[in-house]
Amino acid sequence: MKFFLTILFFITSIFALELDFSVGENGKSLDDNNTVLIFGGIQGDEPGGFHAASLLLSDYNITKGKIIVAPNLAFDSIIKRSRGNNGDLNRKFASISPKDPDYKRVQRIKELILLPEVSMVINLHDGWGFYKPTYIDAMQNPKRWGNSSVIDTSEINASKYPDLENIATQTVNSVNSSLADPKHAYHLKNTKTQELGDTEMLKALTYFVISNHKAAFANEASKNLPVNLRAYYHLLAIENYLKTAGIEFSRDFELTPQGVDKAINKELEVKLFDDRILLSLKNPRKVINYVPFPVNKELNYNTSNELTAVIAEGNSFYIQYGNRFQTRLYPEYLEFSDAFNEITFQVDGNETTASFGSKVKVKENFLIPKIANVRVNIIGFDLGKDESGILVHKKNMQTQYSLDMAGKIYRVEFYELRGVNLQQLLEANTNSKLIKNAKNLGLNTLKMARSKDKFLGSILVEFE
């Protein structure tokens, strides 16, 4: 399936980070108002839910029907590992002041729920302990939430899927047939929100959904379990709900705890500035220095999943994957040139062509040919200002300059010589995210940038 998905970004005004939450579509509507809407990350300290939701966009292919997924509702809270930077987002659906920082976010979520095509909504949570209908101990009792399928009532007035209890019970049985450990058994939890006048649950997202005559289910995984196990149980439940809705799918990994762990922890890709630069993050170094940043373009980027963000902080930028820090970038500000976006060079004696922002695997060596009015800088290979026309082996590389701790991945950068003024041919990428709150550049920084060669783009080479 496509690695970088087409994503609609809904902008919310968030204190400090101002991160947007994203919404992706997977599959094609059959015009039967049978789309399933799935939310993750409504609380930022629940990684099982937001990782499961993210995988539905990056690693699933819906072959019949359609899902809409918003995996990172409280994205700023996810990055900060906070339940909610502006209070509990899941308690703002009954009423919210227009002055609340989450107001626009809540309105956008409601708009998604009220889409005519949406007939079922699934909200993913991680909760402490294990819900049990009867008291066993402090972590296994009726007041706990973990490993439960939660409904607000047994039945609703809806044209599709009115029997919430029956559907949720089927899901519980389905999950329990694939437990990693019998102690993880799921149970149905009916909060009887309206019947009992539960003042907290009356404010929640799922109650807003059923109040608008649509089926809603919350799936809880236990915070006492590792993240991959939580996501595993979420996906087991989601797949059963999708089957209930007649939605068919395939996925790129085996649905086991190990398969989910591998999918969550696979190599990340971040593409910067109209996809000119690829950062392939496979156990990356904690700091990457002298990363070209443009003074004449917007600071945009794309990622291989919707939980990864590039965030400005002082004089640097850092990359975060959900709750987890990846690396910090220290920029070198330059003018960028739009003259071309691919190069042809030799890899292990064979000619290959690669686009900027891509990675090429190398067994033995590579050689970048001389290019008129262009110089080449191979980061970690120190043989002069222009390093084209030289056969490069892994043994020639200084491993401390690799992107990864294993010393295998290196940047190869291309520059238009100052004063050449090559014809500009490329167009800007309009489907990218923006790095917010980058500091304004001083006159000296701009002057320095305009005295240097212009950055064209870069590729990565990965030695075996």
Residue ranges of predicted features:
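Sec-dependent N-terminal signal peptides
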Residues: 3-13
